[in-house]
Amino acid sequence: MSTEMMTTEPVPPLELSDDILGKLDPQCSPSDDLSDQFIKDCDLKKKPRKGKNVQATLNVESDQKKPRRKDTPAVHIPPFIPGVISEHLIKRYDVQERIPKAKSGPALHNSDMEQKRPRRKDTPALHMPPFVAGLTLLRDESAGVILEDEEMDGDKLAI
C-alpha cells in the first residue's frame, strides 16, 4: 500500500488533429445532421431478438385469453328459504340451516322499534333498573314510572 495521497489535478484535454477525427468516422462530418444519421443507423441495426420478443408476444396473447376479474361472472347462490334445505344445497354450497339475521323474532323486533321511535311527551318514561346477576330486587326497587317536570306542571303553564 502506498501512503501517498492521490491528487486531483485537472488533466489537460486530449488534443486530436482534424486528420485523426476524419479517419475515425468517415460518414460523419461536422456539417452533417447527426440525429438523422443516428436514426438511420439505428433502423438498420434493429433486428428482433428471438428469445425476448417471442416471450413478449406470448405474454400479450396469454393476457388476451385470460378473462379479467371484472369480466368473471359471480357465483350464483340461491336465496335462503328457512325450513327448505335439500341435500343438494348442503353438498354444493355448504349451506347450514340458520335463521337470517334480519328477522330475529317479533317480540324483540317490536321492543327495538319502540326504543328507536321518539316517545310522545304525554307518555311517561318506563324506568327499568339494570339487571345484576344473583341479586333480587326489593319491592320498592321494582320497575316504576318517572314523570318529567314538564308533564307534571303542564296543566299549570299557560303558553
Swiss-Prot record:
InterPro entries per the UniProt record, alphabetical: PPP1R17
Any single biological process term in GO: regulation of phosphatase activity
GO molecular function per UniProt: protein phosphatase inhibitor activity; protein serine/threonine phosphatase inhibitor activity
Basic and acidic residues bias: start-end ranges: 62-73, 111-124
Transmembrane segments: none
Cystine residue pairs: none
Cellular component annotations (GO), alphabetically ordered: cytosol
Keyword Phosphoprotein assigned: yes
Phosphothreonine PTM sites in chain numbering: 72, 123
Positions of region (Disordered): 1-79, 98-127
Outcome when changing residue 72 to A: Does not potentiate the phosphorylation of the CREB transcription factor
Superkingdom: Eukaryota
Keywords: Phosphoprotein, Protein phosphatase inhibitor
Tissue expression pattern: Expressed in Purkinje cells of the cerebellum, hippocampus, pons, medulla and eye.
Post-translational modifications reported in the UniProt record: Substrate for cGMP-dependent protein kinase. Phosphorylation of Thr-72 and Thr-123 is required for its phosphatase activity. Phosphorylated by PRKG1 isoform alpha.
Function, in words: Inhibits phosphatase activities of protein phosphatase 1 (PP1) and protein phosphatase 2A (PP2A) complexes.
Protein name as catalogued: Protein phosphatase 1 regulatory subunit 17
